[in-house]
Amino acid sequence: MLEILKKSLKKAPIVKRGKYPYFIHPITDGVPAIDPKLLDEISDYIIEYSDMDVDRILSIEAMGIPLATAISLKTGIPFSIVRKRQYQLPGEIKISQSTGYSKGELYINGIEKGNRILLVDDVISTGGTLRFLVKALEEKGVTISDIIVIVGRGDGVQQLAGEGIRVKTLVDINVSEDGVSILEDTGETN
């Protein structure tokens, strides 16, 4: 299962960002090109194993856009994107967030109180972005049916679980200067 994703992750190039080994992958970075077969495999898996009884799919720019698009096209469920730009539309939700890698503001439009959503993201490391996003959505009165993240790296899933936020990952990885390794399925996050 998810063989295209796993194979592509194992082949992902590693670059250094300071002391941090960073993997580059089409699903998490948009480069090199995103293979439609990869998106097809991922979206099929998400549709099969997620609670799809939702009003909306919600994902985070930029790399959440192709994921949400693929799922939306297959299910007919509309999607909204959490943006880094403010639009000042009525009902816009502003989130101030700080993670291990960045800080700033995010904006959600097209989500209303009482909506039931599927939240999809490309990668989780520290869990910071999802933590702030989930809190903002819950305060708005939105129900989150599932939180699905394609690639799990680091301890973000465990940190969020300790706060009562359940995140499902498709693949958990370890990244070193030698490359990406796929961690065995523990059943805890998948």
From Swiss-Prot:
UniProt entry keywords in alphabetical sequence: Cytoplasm, Glycosyltransferase, Purine salvage, Transferase
GO CC terms of this entry: cytoplasm
Record-linked PROSITE patterns: PUR_PYR_PR_TRANSFER (PS00103)
Matches recorded under InterPro entries: HGPRTase-like, PRibTrfase_dom, PRTase-like, Pur/Pyrimidine_PRTase
SUPFAM superfamilies found in the cross-reference section: PRTase-like
Gene3D superfamilies: 3.40.50.2020
EC number: 2.4.2.8
Top-level class of the enzyme under EC nomenclature: transferase
Catalytic function, reaction form: IMP + diphosphate = hypoxanthine + 5-phospho-alpha-D-ribose 1-diphosphate; GMP + diphosphate = guanine + 5-phospho-alpha-D-ribose 1-diphosphate
Example of a GO biological process term: IMP salvage
GO MF annotations, alphabetized: guanine phosphoribosyltransferase activity; hypoxanthine phosphoribosyltransferase activity
Chief place where the protein resides: cytoplasm
Pathway recorded for this protein: Purine metabolism; IMP biosynthesis via salvage pathway; IMP from hypoxanthine: step 1/1
Subcellular location: Cytoplasm
UniProt xrefs under CDD domains: PRTases_typeI
Domain of life: Archaea
Function: Catalyzes a salvage reaction resulting in the formation of IMP that is energically less costly than de novo synthesis.
Name of protein: Hypoxanthine/guanine phosphoribosyltransferase
Lineage, opening ranks: Archaea, Methanobacteriati, Methanobacteriota, Stenosarchaea group, Methanomicrobia
